[in-house]
Every structure is written in structure tokens, then in C-alpha cells.
Amino acid sequence: MAEFIALIPAAGSGSRMGEDIPKQYRPLASKPMIYHALRTLCSAERIGMVCVVLAPDDTEWARHDWSEFAGKIRVFGCGGATRAESVTNGLKALRAENHVQDQDWILVHDAARPGLSRALVERLLDQLAQDEIGGLLAVPLADTLKRADDTGRVMCTEPRERLWQAQTPQMFRTKLLLEALEKAPTGITDDASAVEALGFSPKLVTGDAYNFKVTYPQDLKLAELILQERTATQN
């Protein structure tokens, strides 16, 4: 029976946040940002392991207490220069230690999406566990899209019908995901794009607006409010 394994690539620098520490360690609701994704993924009973891929020279991870996840996480210091490289290296490390089989499902999640909920994880597992290809969380695009010219003026308005904004986790079987990433064209920004490049069509599973990616400093306040509301509801 196929297992479910989550993988968080956490080797980025987060330069757009303007911080002197990597974004995934930026304090958020009194914890490092990555903590919130770890907590959600580790709480999902069907996920057997959560793999964290750090930069080889990471010095921040050891400064924090991760003991509450000790029975479920596996940490590798094999992150690469890009997200795709980090995921690829993490998969190879899992294989080398016999933690994963070709038909196991890998859920790749961004460390900078602290708003992921347990309900979204369960929805993803429910809808993709029997799928032939796999897929990803995503939300239908709500905003109007404008295409700009080189001077910053509007060239045209793009139709938004059938357009979705990709989120994570993105869930594919080990063998397919590794092959896709190894053959992926330069510049891909997510795992689904690599799978698409092989000619497959991943399934879109409806996510929600809370599962946004923290990219700029102004995103932090919204993420903080979401986490505070969730904590209050749970209590």
C-alpha cells in the first residue's frame, strides 16, 4: 500500500522579505514560520513522515526546539540553489535511506505557507489518493489580469475563465515526480509544472485564500491574524 510522505523544501534565503535570517525562520505567532506548516502536516494521521530539506550551511534550524515533531520528521541538509533542486535532492536522500518507494505519494509544501489547514490536507489526500497522476491545491483566480508592455502600460486584459492560482501541497508519486524534476526545463517554479512538461495533466483540488504564500513583509500581519484566529477557534 502506498504511503504518504510530506516534503518541505526549506533552503531558500527569502531575500524579498528584507530580513537577515531566511524567511522560513522569521518569527510568526511566536514560532518560526516553518513551524506552522510542520505542525499541520505532522498532525495528519495518514502522513507517515515529514521530510525537511535545509541548505547545507543552515545554522538556524538547530537554534529551535522541534522535539514535538521528533517521531515524524526527517531532516536533510541537501538543499540546492533552486526549489526544484531541493525537492530532487530530498527525494534522492529519502530513497538512499529506503524511506520511500516509487509508488509512494509525496506532498511537497512551501515552508512559507503557514496558513495550510488540516482540512485542506485531508481534502487533498481524499481526492488524489486514487488518482492516476496526482495534483495540487489551487484556487480559482478572482482578480482581473492585465498584461503590461515594456513601459508599464496595459497591453490587454486577459480572460480569467479557467485560470487557477497554484498553491501547495502538490502531490505526486515518487517515481513520476523525480523523473519530472530531473527532466524539467529551466525556470520552473513548482512541481506541477515539471509534471506538465512530461505531458501529464495534474488535478486541481480547491484550496482556500488562507493558504497563501508569505512573500513580502506586509504579508506577515495577515498570516499572523489567520493563525491567531485558528488558535482561538481550536481553544
UniProtKB/Swiss-Prot annotation:
Its EC number is 2.7.7.60. The keyword Transferase applies. Keywords: Isoprene biosynthesis, Nucleotidyltransferase, Transferase. CDD domains: CDP-ME_synthetase (cd02516). One of its GO terms (molecular function) is 2-C-methyl-D-erythritol 4-phosphate cytidylyltransferase activity. The record marks R160, K213 as: Positions MEP for the nucleophilic attack. The keyword Acetylation does not apply. Catalyzes the formation of 4-diphosphocytidyl-2-C-methyl-D-erythritol from CTP and 2-C-methyl-D-erythritol 4-phosphate (MEP). This is 2-C-methyl-D-erythritol 4-phosphate cytidylyltransferase. The gene is ispD.
